[in-house]
Design a protein with these regions (language model features):
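Extended, low-polarity segments enriched in aliphatic/aromatic residues
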Residues: 1-289
Length: 289
């Protein structure tokens, strides 16, 4: 059966909230809000004001995990300062899920490459999750969307290295590339299934650079904004975003497509689909004003 993906070309904070209401999926209990806090120096990440209506609606807690590379977010102290500087703690409760160990380990018995996922231990404190993704390019994954947020985004600092290294954290930058992409698909499955259906995905196709929000020095957006998508299927929503980029007549789309293709970005979606926790087949339902 095709997954439903709702789509609007209007990109406003209020429209994000409206799309959640259109989806008709009520998240229950204490809700983790997974988003990207933005590397210091990055100009493209989506700011707190943009997400405020949906987070306030859910009374959600913004959750993040420390990075596994040098920068402004690789230690708890630096990351909290960056979160404050970027305005997140001004509006929301913020939880660095891996600020204190030990990591929470999610088993992935059906994982193709990795059978364990190391996530921030505070994940156990939440009943559900909304994954707020800024869709854009990525220097390693080709693109960043819902699957990246589920995997790398929810992984602890060690867990990020473990995924990048395809199960060998010391190979963080040297592992076989497709094995890294398949590890992301494995890890994403464990988080998606952990919340037992009490999870929603929103992808925003705005400020689309070839670079991720994890880059302190990032290229400016290369193509015009496209819209907001929402679904309960992380695979379908990422596939829909990829398809919208390819369908665009924007003169800058080729630059983003080159980034996706040169990093074999579609393979993460292929690997996730093979694991069966979502579908690449979807019905795109456009919501008009």
């Amino acid at each position: 059966m095709k997954s439903k993906v709702y789509f609007t070309r209007i990109i406003t904070p209020e429209k994000v909230l409206e799309m959640y209401e259109v989806l008709g999926k009520e998240l229950i209990g204490k809700i983790a809000v997974k988003l990207h806090s933005g590397e210091e120096g990055n100009q493209n990440f989506l700011k707190p004001d943009f997400w405020r209506p949906i987070i306030d609606k859910l009374n959600g807690t913004v959750v993040e995990c420390n990075t596994a590379y040098e920068g402004s977010r690789n230690t708890t102290e630096k990351h909290l300062k960056t979160i404050e500087k970027h305005g997140w703690s001004k509006y929301f409760d913020v939880d660095l899920m891996d600020a204190e160990g030990p990591d929470m380990i999610l088993d992935i018995p059906e994982g193709k490459v990795i059978q364990k996922n190391y996530v921030g231990k505070d994940m156990e404190n939440y009943d559900g999750m909304i994954v707020l993704s800024h869709f854009k390019g990525h220097p390693m994954g080709g693109y960043g969307g819902a699957l990246k947020q589920l995997s790398i985004g929810c992984a602890s600092s060690y867990g990020k290295a473990y995924i990048h290294g395809a199960g060998e954290s010391e190979k963080i930058w040297t592992a076989d590339h497709d094995l890294f992409l398949e590890s992301m698909a494995d890890a994403a499955k464990s988080v998606h299934e952990y919340f037992k259906g009490n999870i929603v995905y929103i992808n925003v196709m705005k400020n689309m650079s070839v670079d991720c929000d994890c880059c302190a020095v990032a290229e400016d957006p290369c193509m015009d904004d496209i819209g907001i998508l929402i679904s309960t299927d992380p695979i379908a929503i990422d596939q829909a975003c990829i398809d919208l980029v390819y369908a665009s007549n924007d003169k800058g789309r080729d630059h983003l497509i080159e980034r996706i293709e040169s990093r074999h970005g579609i393979h993460t979606i292929e690997a996730a689909s093979a694991l069966g926790y979502g579908s690449r087949e979807y019905e795109l339902i456009e919501i008009d004003d």
